[in-house]
Design a protein with these regions (language model features):
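Short, surface-exposed beta-strand/strand-loop-strand elements in extracellular ectodomains
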Residues: 311-321
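Short beta-strands within extracellular/lumenal beta-sheet-rich domains
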Residues: 283-298, 332-336
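Bacterial N-terminal signal peptides
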Residues: 12-20
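Extracellular carbohydrate recognition and processing domains
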Residues: 320-342
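A short beta-strand element within beta-rich, extracytoplasmic domains
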Residues: 299-311, 344-350
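Bacterial N-terminal signal peptides that target proteins for export
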Residues: 2-11
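Phosphate-group recognition and catalysis centered on beta-loop-alpha active-site segments
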Residues: 23-284, 345-350
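Exposed low-complexity, polar/acidic, P/S/T/G-rich flexible segments that act as propeptides
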Residues: 352-366
Length: 366
């Protein structure tokens, strides 16, 4: 039974909705970040990170590019591996047993690496050797994927330049390394600004590097809306680097141009959604919910949710990622994720009186 206080709150909310509908300007088309798959589009237990298959999956899921890590073997062959040891991502090739003792990449020749170890996967077909830089870049070229090299090896950047011209990304914290790359390439140079919160100082460093450039950081508090706006207006890229949920949503709202992510997706015009669900001009009282669960499990899927609203809401995607979003005035947010063997769903719960002028959810089958 509704109390007079509840009825009054509902009436005020409906009046606000009616006023909003009478003076709503034409909706602008939002611009979302370029999506880069961190260590490729890996899938836990199935598709290994930093693998050729992770490049193919990045193409399948609609990512623009992949980030990869480059290191030398003992005999100076460049291969793709993030850790100093093989233990987290590899098994013994002979019997697929776990590596109980630390196995350092720097202690192995390339022949030993290829002969004795494979990447971990539940699918025997994906238990492949750790790829060379050339093998991974060849896969990027085959599938039309932009490579982002996280590497301290100048030789790796020369290989990328030979294979891609200027259409690749150099991702490193060293100004001197970026300046070296600039002697032979006008690739996109992404610099780690460190703890310096000054956008002006970042611009000064980037101008010294020259050419196409930007910043990349894992520091969530650095990428404020003014910081992002200042760099973007100066013509530079701003990358949010592996921000966990829900911080990647704030980075998107603040205006980053690139998201380097382990899970995030944005609406993708390259693909026709399998299903689209929409609603307009919905008023919610505190604890009111909007819930949608599809009926079919999808092997390789994506779910995005676009929202124009005023108020505070809690959003859950696939009962996996949870966001608390607040817009004091009518504003836009977009969140999304990739998934494997899952039934897509979302839930929106109002935390205070909220008006959702527009909701669009897209489900993709990749």
């Amino acid at each position: 039974m509704k109390t007079p206080k509840t009825r009054k709150a509902g009436l005020l909310l409906m009046m606000a909705l009616a006023l909003f509908m009478s003076c709503t300007p034409k909706k602008e088309t939002p611009v979302y970040p370029t999506m880069i798959a961190h260590r490729g589009c890996w899938l836990k237990g199935l598709v290994p990170e930093n693998s050729v298959e992770a490049v193919r999956m990045a193409k399948r899921f609609g990512y623009t590019g992949i980030e990869c890590d480059v290191h030398y073997t003992k005999d100076s062959v460049m291969v793709i591996l993030h850790d100093k040891t093989l233990n987290r991502t590899a098994r013994r090739a002979s019997d697929y047993s776990k590596l109980e003792q630390p196995v350092k990449l720097s202690d192995l020749t390339f022949e030993e690496l290829r002969r004795d170890y494979v990447l971990e996967s539940s699918d025997p077909a994906l238990r492949t050797p750790i790829p060379t830089l050339e093998e991974l870049l060849s896969a990027c070229k085959e599938h039309g994927i932009l490579p982002m090299l996280h590497s301290s090896l100048p030789e790796s950047y020369r290989v990328a330049q030979q294979m891609f011209g200027d259409e690749w990304v150099c991702f490193h914290g060293s100004d001197s390394l970026h300046k070296l790359v600039r002697t032979f390439s006008n690739c996109i140079a992404l610099l780690d600004p460190g703890a310096d919160k000054s956008a002006e100082n970042a611009i000064e460093r980037l101008n010294r590097i020259g050419g196409r450039a930007g910043v990349s950081t894992m520091k969530r508090g650095l990428l404020t809306q003014p910081y992002c706006q200042t760099l973007r207006e100066a013509g530079f890229e701003v990358q949010a680097s592996i921000f966990p949920c829900p911080h990647e949503a704030q980075a998107t709202r603040n205006g980053v141009s690139i998201q380097l992510s382990d899970f995030s997706l944005m609406p993708n015009n390259k693909f026709q959604p399998w299903e689209t669900w929409e609603a307009e001009n919905t008023a919610l009282l505190p604890l009111d919910k909007i819930e949608k669960k599809w009926s079919e499990s999808i092997d390789y899927g994506g779910l995005t949710l676009e929202l124009d609203f005023k108020g505070t809401i809690e959003v859950k995607l696939n009962n996996e990622n949870t966001y608390t979003l607040t817009q004091e005035e009518y504003g836009h947010d977009c969140i999304g994720l990739r998934f494997h063997h899952s039934v897509p769903s979302f839930q929106i719960e109002a935390k205070d009186s909220t008006v959702l002028k527009y909701i669009k959810s897209k489900v993709y089958k990749f």
